[in-house]
Amino acid sequence: MAALKYAGMEDTDSEDELPPGWEERSTKDGWVYYANHEEMKTQWEHPKTGKKKRCAGALPYGWEQETDDKGQIFYVDHINKRKTYFDPRQAFTVEDMQVKPKRYDGNTGALEILHGQDLSDKVIIVTGANSGIGFETARSFALHGAHVILACRNQSRASKAASLIMGEWSKARVEVLPLDLASLRSVRQFAELFKATKLPLHVLVCNAAVCSQPWRLTEDGFESTFQICHLGHFLLVQLLQDVLRLSAPARVVVVSSESHRFTDLLDSCGNLDLDLLSPPQKNYWSLLAYNRAKLCNLLFSSELHRRMSPHGICCNALHPGSMMFTSIHRSWWLLTLLFSLARPFTKSMQQGAATTVYCAVAPELEGIGGMYFNNCFRCLPSPQAQDPAAALSLWELSERLVQERSTPPQVL
C-alpha cells in the first residue's frame, strides 16, 4: 500500500490483504479494527481470516499521534518532518506471538539496528566519541532519544561532534565531559563530574583506543597504548560501577579487535607479564602493543561480566570491523596509506558502529554477557581470551596498578 511505503514500511502480499472497500485502522491504545466503507460499519475481526490483532508496542521514536479538524487521527514523524493517516505501528501488528529477533550482518548500519527504538529513558557514555566509530555510535544513540555523554580528551573536537549531532536533530541530548584515558587523574575527575550530574547510567561504551603510537610513557608511568586502551577503561568502570548497579539493568560494551588473536600476554612460564603489557622502549612494537591491549579488552570484559552480572550489569566485547578508515592510525603514515587503499572495500562508519550498538541495546541480549561479537554475531575469541585464569590475573594486576597510582583525597 502507498501508506506503508510512505511510512517507511515494506508492503507484502499475505493472507492479511483486505477485500476491496475495506480499511485497516487502529485505536489510540493500539487495537486494530476494520472499516467496511461499502456497508459503513466496523468490526474487530479481519474480514478474511477472522483474527484480531493489536499494534506491537508504542509509536516508533519521533512519531506523535494527533487529530485533525474533522476528528480523524493522523501521525506526525517529527524526525523526517512528514505526516500520514497510516498508523506506523500497523506494520508490526501481532497476534500475541513472540517475534523472532532480526538477524544482522556486516552490511548492517547502526541506525538500522535502532529502527523504531525509543532510547529516551537511557543515559549512555561513549568514550572516544568525537570521531570515527565512536562518533557514529554516539550519533546513532542520540538520534533515537538517548541522553549521550561524549567522553573525550580533545574538548574542541568533542564540542564540534556534539554540534553536528544537534544540528542534525535539535532535540538531541548530547553533553561533553573531559576524559583523558592516558591520565588516571583525569579518569577520576571524569567520574566525579559524571556522578555530580546525578544521572543514571544504563550503557557504558569503552570505545576509545590508539594504534601505532610512538613509544611514550603516560604521566602514570605506563606505556600509552596499554593505559589508553585498557587500564584507563578498567579504572573508569571501577569508579562508575556503583552508578551502573543503581541503574540496573545496565550494560558495559568493550570495543576490542580481531587483532587480539595475533599475540599473547604470558611469559615463558605461563604467567602474566607486565613487561609485555607495558614494555620498555627497547622492546616496544606499536602493532604488537595494540594487539595485546585488545586481548586485554576481551579478558577484562569476561571477568567484568563474571563479577557484575549478579548485580544486573552485563558486559560483552566486540570487533567493529577491519581496516576501516578512522583516525586511530593517524600516528603512522604507512598505516594511513594502507587504510586509504583499503577504504573502498571496507565498512562505512555506520556499519562499523553497528555491532557496538547491537551489544548496547539489543533486547535479545538482555541479561546475557561474557561474549564476543563480530558483525552482530557471537563468535569465539582466541583460546587465551577464553582463559579464566588469565582474565583473573589481569584483573588483579590492573586493580593493583590503579591502586598504586591512586591520588589521596584532598582535604577541604
Curated annotation (Swiss-Prot):
- Residues at which substrate binds: 257
The Enzyme Commission number assigned here is 1.1.1.-
**Protein name stated in the entry:** WW domain-containing oxidoreductase
Which region ranges are annotated with the description Disordered? Answer: 1-24
Coiled-coil stretches are: none
Classification via CDD domains: human_WWOX_like_SDR_c-like, WW
Q: List the keywords (alphabetical).
A: Apoptosis, Cytoplasm, Golgi apparatus, Lysosome, Mitochondrion, NADP, Oxidoreductase, Phosphoprotein, Repeat, Wnt signaling pathway
Query: Which enzyme class?
Result: oxidoreductase
Under Gene Ontology molecular function, one entry of this record is:
oxidoreductase activity
Q: Which InterPro entries match?
A: NAD(P)-bd_dom_sf, SDR_fam, WW_dom, WW_dom_sf, WWOX_SDR_c-like
Binding residues annotated for NADP(+), in chain numbering? 128-134
- Give the similarity note: Belongs to the short-chain dehydrogenases/reductases (SDR) family.
Primary location class? cytoplasm
Domain WW residue range list: 16-49, 57-90
Q: Where does the record place the catalytic residues?
A: 290
Q: Which organism is it from?
A: Danio rerio
Name of one Pfam family that matches: WW
Which GO BP terms apply? Answer: apoptotic process; intracellular calcium ion homeostasis; Wnt signaling pathway
The terms describing its cellular component in GO are: Golgi apparatus; lysosome; mitochondrion
Q: Where in the cell is it found?
A: Cytoplasm; Mitochondrion; Golgi apparatus; Lysosome
Q: Which PANTHER family match?
A: PHOSPHATIDYLINOSITOL-GLYCAN BIOSYNTHESIS CLASS F PROTEIN, PHOSPHATIDYLINOSITOL-GLYCAN BIOSYNTHESIS CLASS F PROTEIN-RELATED
